[in-house]
């Protein structure tokens, strides 16, 4: 079964996505995968407010957002607060290692999103390189942990 509840060191996720259909699908997929999605927001400003007010373990973040803030700005703030960042965007930037652990390219399926989140979880919680995920670029390096 693809969607199953399982123990996780990531308890609370925040999704930042400006496309309503993608946001809905991502939220549903992650909730069915056993994650607690505390909110889904469409702008950097809303994301920063959630980061300031809530305990968040990981950020699922598009780089293109509604509002005036860029995804890179949000990722940098999240990283500075110790929040793991998985970029989910149309084209993964080569130079995002300073703001994210990995990037999943859109479009993606439900299984790819779950595998990508679990891969980031492996990096953060087990301090080891995860299995390769189709469509995902990894920035994290074990020696950096």
Please place each PLM-identified region on the residue numbering:
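Non-catalytic signal-transmission and effector/linker regions of two-component phosphorelay proteins
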Residues: 1-12, 109-145
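Two-component/phosphorelay signaling modules centered on CheY-like receiver
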Residues: 20-39
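Conserved acidic carboxylate
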Residues: 17
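Acidic, metal-coordinating helix/loop segments flanking the phosphotransfer/catalytic sites
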Residues: 2, 27, 40-58
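Active-site residues of response regulator receiver
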Residues: 62-63
């Amino acid at each position: 079964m693809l969607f199953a509840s399982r123990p996780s060191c990531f308890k609370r996720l925040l999704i930042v996505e400006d496309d309503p259909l993608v946001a809905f699908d991502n939220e549903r997929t992650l909730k069915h995968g056993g994650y607690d999605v505390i909110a889904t927001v469409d702008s950097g400003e809303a994301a920063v407010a959630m980061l300031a007010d809530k305990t968040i373990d990981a950020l699922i973040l598009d780089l293109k957002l509604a509002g005036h803030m860029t995804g890179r700005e949000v990722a940098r703030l999240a990283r500075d607060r110790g929040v793991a960042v998985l970029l989910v965007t149309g084209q993964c930037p080569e130079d995002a290692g300073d703001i994210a652990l990995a990037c999943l390219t859109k479009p993606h399926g439900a299984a790819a999103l779950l595998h990508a989140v679990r891969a980031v979880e492996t990096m953060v919680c087990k301090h080891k390189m995860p299995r390769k995920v189709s469509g995902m670029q990894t920035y994290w390096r074990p020696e950096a942990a």
